[in-house]
Structures are given as structure tokens and as C-alpha cells.
Amino acid sequence: MAPTLLTEEQRKELIPKDWEMVVGRDAIKKTFTFKDFNQAFSFMTRVALVAEQMNHHPEWFNVYNRVEITLATHDCSGLSVNDTKMADIMNQFFNQLHQ
């Protein structure tokens, strides 16, 4: 079953508060900053493994200790529950690295 766009109520409930809407696009974004490149790459590796399992891949950009991520679902041309799940997983991985 193809993913569907989030309703306004779902958006308010499911989009993590620390993620921002992308201007001019139905997508969310966040920049994660790490101690160093190794920590950033470790985060990206963990996310990549989950993304492959979910068949839901982020758009991302990495320079040294910073990873900029944008999430949207191409199959429905906007935000779906897959994006909010992925955002929650990324936040969890980030928090685990900073305990």
C-alpha cells in the first residue's frame, strides 16, 4: 500500500518539535551536529541500515561533524508517517550518541 500524505492533525501530533518545515516544499529538515566526523559517520551508518529496512531513504548532506537531513516521501509527494518515524529514529540515535 502506497503511503499517504499526513493530515494537518497528524502533522501537529507526529512531526517532532525539533524538526522544521522546508520552505516551499512539503518536507521536514534538521541539522545534527556531532563531536567529530567519526561520530557523524557512525550516525549516518546506523540511519542507512534502518532506511534500507524501511525502504525509506533520507536526503542528506555531510561536512565533517554536521549532517543536514531532509525527509519527504516521494511516493506521495510530501510528508507521510514514514517521515515522522524516520525523524523519531534519527533523534533516538542522536540522543544515544550524546548520553
Swiss-Prot record:
Give the superkingdom in one word.
Answer: Eukaryota
* CDD domains (UniProt xref): PCD_DCoH_subfamily_b
MF annotations from Gene Ontology: 4-alpha-hydroxytetrahydrobiopterin dehydratase activity
Query: Gene3D superfamilies per the record?
Result: Transcriptional coactivator/pterin dehydratase
As recorded in UniProt, coiled-coil segments are none
Biological process according to GO: tetrahydrobiopterin biosynthetic process
Q: Which reaction is recorded as catalysed by this protein?
A: (4aS,6R)-4a-hydroxy-L-erythro-5,6,7,8-tetrahydrobiopterin = (6R)-L-erythro-6,7-dihydrobiopterin + H2O
Supply the EC number(s). 4.2.1.96
Q: Which UniProt keywords apply?
A: Lyase, Tetrahydrobiopterin biosynthesis
Extract the SUPFAM superfamilies matched here: PCD-like
- List, alphabetically, the InterPro entries matched: PCD_sf (IPR036428), Pterin_deHydtase (IPR001533)
Instruction: Name the Pfam families on file.
Output: Pterin_4a
- Keyword flag Flavoprotein: no
The answer to keyword Coiled coil applying to this record is: no
Signal peptide span: none
Similarity comment: Belongs to the pterin-4-alpha-carbinolamine dehydratase family.
NCBIfam families assigned to the protein according to its UniProt record, in alphabetical order: PRK00823.1-3
Role: Involved in tetrahydrobiopterin biosynthesis.
Recorded protein name is Pterin-4-alpha-carbinolamine dehydratase
Organism field:
Dictyostelium discoideum (Social amoeba)
Specify the taxonomic lineage: Eukaryota, Amoebozoa, Evosea, Eumycetozoa, Dictyostelia
Please state the gene responsible for encoding this protein: pcbd
